[in-house]
């Protein structure tokens, strides 16, 4: 039986990394690439604030082709939808069978993605649905929402110390948007990515740690 050809929605963080790992262990799927939305004004991963250079290094460490979906800044819902639907229409013509997402719990997000693909022959796949992902890779906290999570955690390692220090009420996987991560090593990579932590800045109501390639420091 032929494997399903799939592409993975890649955020640069832990959930998409673990979704990749589950696919790598499966005999049902052939991973043909990853795709990511990038803020064209800053050349950074949307929401996570990770540099495109590091995004490319992740793809190289995984041995997978990367498709960048550029979105403007600021980006309206209409502009975002236009960019995503353009990508979907393009890959639907390339023999791709499905798109994989690392969503865990939120039904509304899952329904939104299913609706996006409903008119195509692409299948939406959720390989992590309902699974906890507390300790899955070596990651750094790239972004925090200071309304939910202390600013001091930006640039912190995602480890037992970090999890123990989280205030009550914060999801340990950051599934309510409390924080976002960058994966620099893990079972899904062929080799680790050398990084360092640069400036920590506050922008648009979020606190971002500028994660740098090690040689840039």
Predicted region positions:
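Nucleotide-activated chemistry modules centered on ATP-dependent adenylation/adenylyltransferase
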Residues: 1-217
């Amino acid at each position: 039986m032929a494997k399903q050809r799939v592409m993975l929605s890649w955020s640069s963080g832990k959930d998409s990394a673990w979704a990749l790992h589950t696919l790598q262990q499966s005999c049902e799927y052939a991973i043909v690439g990853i795709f990511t939305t990038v803020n064209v004004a800053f050349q950074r991963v949307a929401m996570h604030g990770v540099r495109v250079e590091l995004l490319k290094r992740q793809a190289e460490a995984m041995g997978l082709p990367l498709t960048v979906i550029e979105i403007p800044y600021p980006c309206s819902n209409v502009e975002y939808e236009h960019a995503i639907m353009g990508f979907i229409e393009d890959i639907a013509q390339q023999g791709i069978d499905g798109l994989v997402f690392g969503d865990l719990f939120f039904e509304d997000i899952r329904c939104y993605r299913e609706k996006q693909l409903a008119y195509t022959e692409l299948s939406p796949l959720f390989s992590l649905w309902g699974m906890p992902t507390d300790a899955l890779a070596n990651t750094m906290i790239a972004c925090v929402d200071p309304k939910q999570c202390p600013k001091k955690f930006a640039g912190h390692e995602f480890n037992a110390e970090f999890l123990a220090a989280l205030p009550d009420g914060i999801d340990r996987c950051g599934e309510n948007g409390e924080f976002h991560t960058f994966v620099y090593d893990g079972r899904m990579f062929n080799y680790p990515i050398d990084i360092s932590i640069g400036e920590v800045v506050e922008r648009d109501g979020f606190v971002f740690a500028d994660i740098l390639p090690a040689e840039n420091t």
